[in-house]
């Protein structure tokens, strides 16, 4: 059954109540512009020994306009470079997309935490869902999310893709219904 929380503080309390000593994965999903990154970073600031892993670091730039949102990300690389090591209690490093060059470059340092927050529209899709301890949907009306996304991306190459991305998000939500599969729903507006 899906639980609703009102604030990030409520979400942090819920995570702490469920968190155990083993590695713990919180997955935060929502449509583009919903506020996923904001919720993820605010949550991580409230939790001891946590780190945020944005799925945008795993975008495949050449696939950003592919019809299916799932094809925009290299989810198998998330599993290989992050989740396998993390769930074994090992420190990890991964390669992120450098937007300027289109190349994969190592992140600075090594992540050695007991909780990670995966953040992105596909954060609890296969194969990632098998590793997720708590799934969170950021519920934001489509028009609000799209407006935010356009404002955020103003002046970048991404601003021109929002019409396509909005349709892709709508298709993804209709097919996969992540908001119905989430353990927790939090308002993003």
Language model feature labels by segment:
Residues 1-26:
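Extreme N-terminal, non-catalytic leader segments
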Residues 31:
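P-loop (Walker A) phosphate-binding loop of NTP-binding proteins
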Residues 36:
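Conserved lysine of the Walker
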Residues 39:
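Hydrophobic positions on the alpha1 helix immediately C-terminal to the Walker A/P-loop
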Residues 44-53:
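Post-Walker A helix-loop "phosphate-sensing" segment adjacent to the P-loop in P-loop NTPases
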Residues 51, 60-110, 115-116:
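Conserved nucleotide-sensing/catalytic segment adjacent to the nucleotide-binding pocket
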Residues 103, 125, 154-189:
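Small-molecule kinase domains that catalyze NTP-dependent phosphoryl transfer to phosphate-bearing small molecules
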Residues 104-152:
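ATP-dependent NMP and nucleoside kinases share a basic, alpha-helical "lid"
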